[in-house]
From Swiss-Prot:
Topology relative to the membrane: Peripheral membrane protein
Family note: Belongs to the PMP outer membrane protein family.
Protein name: Probable outer membrane protein PmpE
Leader peptide range in chain numbering: 1-18
Subcellular location: Secreted, Cell wall; Cell outer membrane
The keyword Transcription appears for this protein: no
Main subcellular localisation: secreted
Domain of life: Bacteria
Gene encoding the protein: pmpE
The entry's keywords: Cell outer membrane, Cell wall, Membrane, Secreted, Signal, Transmembrane, Transmembrane beta strand
Amino acid sequence: MKKLFFFVLIGSSILGFTREVPPSILLKPILNPYHMTGLFFPKVNLLGDTHNLTDYHLDNLKCILACLQRTPYEGAAFTVTDYLGFSDTQKDGIFCFKNLTPESGGVIGSPTQNTPTIKIHNTIGPVLFENNTCHRLWTQTDPENEGNKAREGGAIHAGDVYISNNQNLVGFIKNFAYVQGGAISANTFAYKENKSSFLCLNNSCIQTKTGGKGGAIYVSTSCSFENNNKDLLFIQNSGCAGGAIFSPTCSLIGNQGDIVFYSNHGFKNVDNATNESGDGGAIKVTTRLDITNNGSQIFFSDNISRNFGGAIHAPCLHLVGNGPTYFTNNIANHTGGAIYITGTETSKISADHHAIIFDNNISANATNADGSSSNTNPPHRNAITMDNSAGGIELGAGKSQNLIFYDPIQVTNAGVTVDFNKDASQTGCVVFSGATVLSADISQANLQTKTPATLTLSHGLLCIEDRAQLTVNNFTQTGGIVALGNGAVLSSYQHSTTDATQTPPTTTTTDASVTLNHIGLNLPSILKDGAEMPLLWVEPISTTQGNTTTYTSDTAASFSLNGATLSLIDEDGNSPYENTDLSRALYAQPMLAISEASDNQLQSESMDFSKVNVPHYGWQGLWTWGWAKTENPTTTPPATITDPKKANQFHRTLLLTWLPAGYIPSPKHKSPLIANTLWGNILFATENLKNSSGQELLDRPFWGITGGGLGMMVYQEPRKDHPGFHMHTSGYSAGMITGNTHTFSLRFSQSYTKLNERYAKNYVSSKNYSCQGEMLLSLQEGLMLTKLIGLYSYGNHNSHHFYTQGEDLSSQGEFHSQTFGGAVFFDLPLKPFGRTHILTAPFLGAIGMYSKLSSFTEVGAYPRTFITETPLINVLIPIGVKGSFMNATHRPQAWTVELAYQPVLYRQEPSISTQLLAGKGMWFGHGSPASRHALAYKISQKTQLLRFATLQLQYHGYYSSSTFCNYLNGEVSLRF
């Protein structure tokens, strides 16, 4: 919305300075690229007659401007018989505003007998049509008079309108037509391959005898929006039929920006004739509507229809393959709160790649003359109404996706088929839920989907949750799972139809036929606080006499659970044991209720419970089960039962008992990455401790400063079912050094690290701050050199976990760490190696490291809490030999090579307490195992650049059966 109002503000500002131009002037630029103020010319300077155009091209112009034209022609600014093209208009754009004609086409029009083509393409600047009008007063007394013919196209009236490949906003704002096409009226309209947004804002048309069709766009054959890069915005347009768009066929295909239909109105306010009813608050088509393969979000929100279809009225609708799609707060004064479907072709709504959500769409049922609702049929929630006698609708969701109805749907005729997840690729969830219904609005009308149609579930999940009720006459399950959650009701009913044309009227009844072969109980939903167990119900038969309705049990209903498998699942149909707190025992927990007309009418005693106890991750334990049976007394005469819930005599409750036995985490939740962050800290700090500051003992006092860059790469191999990791670090350091016979140095460094889990996208990004102090001592008059080093490091870390196995989810966490380290090295004096100039000496050292993490909780999918139970402690004893070689060129150089065996003297492996918040399961995470023996190496080279300046390069690391570590440092020292 911010983008929308930005464009509106900019457009209005550009137009503001031209609005007082005398109305007798039609403004059209000449080819010379003068400043915009030079584009205002008197009418005599125009090139050609703009009201008698046949084949006219306006190409490569700096600006096209038409304002305040009031003419008697069809097209206040341009009258076209064949073709008018706007091409390659430069950055100043096209502006047409406040033009007026009593005929059709507020800016561009055509004689009645002609159907010209209008083409706007390849423009760089904005294209804006604002406040244009085609209008003539209409009189009811003589509707056939020529003066009362249709006035259409508030901005453009033509045969074909093509808008393509434009670089900037194309906008139609506050245009008005008396009959149809508040902004555009055409035989064909195509908006394709544009690089910027399309805006229709506050356009309107009103109804005459022919009907006010298309508040923004009216098309008599086909309308298309295809392969555009930016947003398509239809805001606050109004008309009788199709508040924004009216067309026989309409397609929105392959667009990459958001598609928004907001606060459009389909109304009826001038003529009471019924030529075109006020249907489709946003879109009305008479043949087919395709909204497919659009990459971004789609919104139909706050649209209103005077009759049917608060957002969409269509005989056939295909809504498939799109980005996240939302139908919210739409209102139809009759039925079809969001969508109204009338045709006999098969419609399809599928959440293939992202969710589709229907929420708080209202069917107002305004049946009284004053527009009010009947007390017997008040306003209620309604997502979709299918009022066709044949055909069908396919409702589905792709893998890990959801098609969610927070509003009931209505299918009125038995000849219609409803297929849930018909295609094999549709393994997601079709959900009926009452989760968003406020407590004050809880009623059967807001929760129940009741239909005589034939329903079939083939794949995936059909979920009924949070007090929603699905009442069916004919339901068959050939595959998938019927998932029942908190307060869900799946019921059967006897459908009856009355033929009023017969004398006396005849009533035909159809007995219920429901077959289930796999039921899933949504364990997290049923066990949450305040939840109710789901219900399978054979609804009684109602009989109304006068003002009294009584109920009798339906013994003829066929509702079969014979051989049906019972599973325990979560809301996505997966194992529930990681998402449900099963740490405590459950005793005789009510999980499923059955209300039936005769004993074992549903054949529940023949259900298959073999899938209840299956191997799984998460909480471990054992389920046992049994049925509790109750039978109502039969003393009450059936004719006196007025409560439908008391009509059935037989009731069963499934009771489950759970005995817990520990917790086993799923591999996708274990996350060794967090513990491996400690290993990353330790490895980096260890190599820092080995990194010499270039200290040396001199025969005079000195002090100096140092600075340089560093980098490190670590490859940790997978071992013992741990994935391993690789780490990349870069940073810089600065410090000071001082001394004489003993030296002391202090160094500060900052580094940036990315630690990636091997064979996965998971990673931790870190920023570390380190302080390191070093002292070099000469003992026993130079017989032994001792180096003491201490280090402290503080790190800020951001973890990123990705769940890619059939999901597209992620979680993030922020935490910090502290690392402490110390080292001591003992070197004997360097001595010549044989007769060579190479000096050698043995050395011995000890390195101790300690690192721990702060506790933190992730956000995102599957959030977890991490707490360091035991920090990582690692003590090394490197022992080896080093050799040194010097040359005395004009830039003296010294080379040193070290080779050492580096065993682990003591190690405390890190232990990270991890808890999955959804199910409160806890386990201890460990890092990737590291070898206890390694070969360490170091190569350093020092060059004296100037008397007081030296350059030192160091490469060191170690190799083991588990780890390959490489560290590189370059440093310049200035000594005084």
